[in-house]
Design a protein with these regions (language model features):
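Conserved alpha/beta-hydrolase catalytic His-Asp/Glu region
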Residues: 182-236
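A catalytic-pocket lid/entrance helix-loop region that shapes and gates access to the active site
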Residues: 157-185
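Conserved serine/cysteine hydrolase catalytic core
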Residues: 214-271, 276-279
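Active-site loop/oxyanion-hole signature of alpha/beta-hydrolase fold enzymes
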Residues: 42-45, 87-131, 297
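Alpha/beta-hydrolase fold catalytic core
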Residues: 1-59, 83-86, 124-125, 303-312
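Catalytic histidine-centered segment of alpha/beta-hydrolase-like enzymes
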Residues: 283-292, 296
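Conserved HGGG/HGGXW glycine-rich cap/lid loop of the alpha/beta-hydrolase fold
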Residues: 50-98
Length: 312
C-alpha cells in the first residue's frame, strides 16, 4: 500500500472529490461550491459542517457513529450533478470529524440532538429535509422529538430504534480497536479488513478524512474514543417519537445489512402505517458508501421543492 506523505503535504480536504466522481462514473467539471463552516454551541464548543452549494441549504445530512460529514461526499456530488442549484449541509456530529469533543463524552442520540438543532438553525435555517444514517438517524428522531415542526420530511438510512448490540456487533468491534496506529498502512489495513466490499481507493479517502497524523508518523481516528455504551432498551423512547411524528417518513434499508431486520421494519410500519420502506440491493449498513448513486437517486426523488421557506 505504501506509506502516504505527511497530511500537511498529501491531504487537502476537498482535493479528493475528483476521485470520488471518477470512481462512480460522474462527470467532473471542477470542484462544486463547497466549504467548511462552524456553529457555536451554547457552552462555547463548535460543531463543524460541510456546506454544499451556494444557495440556502434545503437539507441537513447526519452521519453515523465513528463517521464524519465526508461519508456523504459521493452522494453530494451525485445530488449536485442531478441539480446544480441544490444546497445542503452535512454535519460532523459532536465528538466526530472536526467537531469538538465533549467533556462528558456523551454522544448518545438525545445528547447530540440539541447540538445538531443549533447547527441546523445556524447553518441551514430554511432546511426542510432531514437525512440521518445510523446514529445520525437516531439523533434525527431525538431532534424531532424536541422540535417536531423543524423539518418537513425525515429519511432514515439503515436505522431504527430497534438496533441493539448484537445487530451492531461488527461496527462495535471495528470502532473499539486500537486508539493509535503506527502508520497509515496499519490504520488502512484494519479498515479494509472490516469493509471487504469497498474499494481500497474509497477506504483510503475515508481514512484520510476520518483520521489524523501525529508528528511521529502515527495515526489516530478523529472521533472521541471515550464514548459510553448504550444501555439495552434505552432507545425505546425513540419508537414513541417515531410513532408520534406526522411528517413523511422513509426508511432506506441495505439488503445486506444486519442492523435493520424484518422485525424492526414491522414495528416501524405498525407505528407509522404510512411510512415508506425502500431496500437498496447489495448495500450493507453504510449505504452512502456502498451504493452512493442509488441513495442519491432516492434522495433526489424526495428532495424539497422550492418554496417561500427556501428563498433568501
Amino acid at each position: 500500500m505504501g506509506r502516504v506523505p505527511p497530511m500537511s503535504e498529501a491531504y487537502e480536504e476537498f482535493g479528493l472529490l475528483a476521485d470520488n466522481a471518477r470512481e462512480v462514473g460522474l462527470a467532473w467539471n471542477g470542484r462544486p461550491a463547497v466549504v467548511r463552516r462552524e456553529a457555536r454551541m451554547r457552552d462555547g464548543r463548535t460543531l463543524s459542517a460541510v456546506v454544499w452549494g451556494s444557495g440556502p441549504p434545503s437539507a441537513v445530512l447526519i452521519h453515523g457513529r465513528s463517521q464524519n460529514a465526508h461519508t456523504w461526499d459521493t452522494v453530494a456530488l451525485a445530488l449536485l450533478a442531478d441539480d446544480a442549484n441544490r444546497a445542503f449541509v452535512a454535519v460532523d456530529l459532536p465528538g466526530h470529524g472536526h467537531s469538538q469533543w465533549k467533556d462528558d463524552h456523551d454522544y448518545r442520540a438525545e445528547a447530540n440532538a440539541p447540538d445538531v438543532l443549533v447547527a441546523a438553525d445556524a447553518l441551514a435555517p430554511q432546511a426542510r429535509l432531514l437525512v440521518g444514517m445510523s446514529l445520525g438517524g437516531l439523533t434525527s428522531l431525538a431532534l424531532l422529538g424536541d422540535a417536531p415542526k423543524r423539518f418537513d420530511r425525515l429519511i432514515l438510512v439503515d436505522i431504527t430504534p430497534g438496533v441493539n448490540p448484537g445487530k451492531g456487533r461488527a461496527i462495535a468491534e471495528f470502532t473499539s480497536g486500537p486508539e493509535r496506529f503506527a502508520s497509515f498502512d496499519e490504520i488502512l489495513e484494519r479498515t479494509l479488513r472490516y469493509n471487504p466490499g469497498r474499494s481500497e481507493a474509497s477506504l483510503r479517502r475515508g481514512v484520510l478524512h476520518n483520521a489524523r497524523e501525529f508528528p511521529d508518523g502515527s495515526w489516530s481516528w478523529r472521533w472521541d474514543p471515550g464514548r459510553p455504551a448504550v444501555a439495552p432498551g434505552s432507545l425505546a423512547p425513540l419508537w414513541d417519537v417515531l410513532g408520534e411524528l406526522t411528517l413523511p417518513l422513509t426508511l432506506v434499508r441495505g439488503s445486506a445489512s444486519p442492523v435493520v431486520d424484518d422485525d424492526d421494519v414491522a414495528e416501524l410500519v405498525r407505528r407509522r402505517p404510512d411510512a415508506e420502506v425502500v431496500v437498496v440491493e447489495g448495500a450493507g449498513h453504510s449505504i452512502q458508501g456502498d451504493r452512493p448513486l442509488e441513495l442519491a437517486e432516492l434522495l433526489s426523488a424526495r428532495w424539497p421543492t422550492p418554496s417561500a421557506r427556501e428563498r433568501p
